[in-house]
A protein has these predicted regions:
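Catalytic-loop region of hydrolases
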Residues: 1-71
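N-terminal cap/lid subdomain of alpha/beta-hydrolase-fold enzymes
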Residues: 58-131
Length: 131
């Protein structure tokens, strides 16, 4: 079993209990006009030091009040299931603009129903296929 704790601080996710992580603040995305209007962080957290296994994650701050907001952990898994599904197709702060494909980068827009309206959101992948 693997255990690590999360401690949320202003503007960043801090991982404890010997978990090593690397992260990057994402300020823009292809297909989204302008800077992102929310705090999006991506990175890897080490889950098996001996074998060098890491999990990729997206972290999005809540619109509802930072550290006092509820914390939601969304884990995807299984063959052909990307953590991007949760971020852009299900509960995340942006979604694809539905329009006929014209050969360019798909456009993105903010999701008015994002769960980040009420909670801090950590999305990660834990599945049976290689990522």
């Amino acid at each position: 079993y693997f255990f690590f704790s999360f401690r949320l601080t202003t503007g960043q996710l801090t991982l404890g209990a010997n978990a090593v992580s690397s992260s990057k603040l994402v300020k823009s995305l292809p297909g989204f006009d302008g800077l992102l209007p929310f705090h999006l962080e991506t990175g890897y957290v080490e889950v098996d030091e001996v074998n060098g296994a890491e999990l990729f994650y997206y972290f999005v701050e809540s619109d509802a009040g930072g550290e006092d907001a509820p914390f939601l952990l969304w884990i995807t898994g299984g063959d052909h299931c990307s953590v991007l599904n949760g971020l852009a197709l299900e509960i995340g702060p942006f979604q694809f603009v539905i329009e006929p494909y014209d050969g360019t980068v798909p456009r993105l827009k903010t999701n008015p129903y994002s769960w980040t309206k009420v909670a801090l959101l950590l999305l990660s992948y834990s599945g049976s296929c290689p990522v």
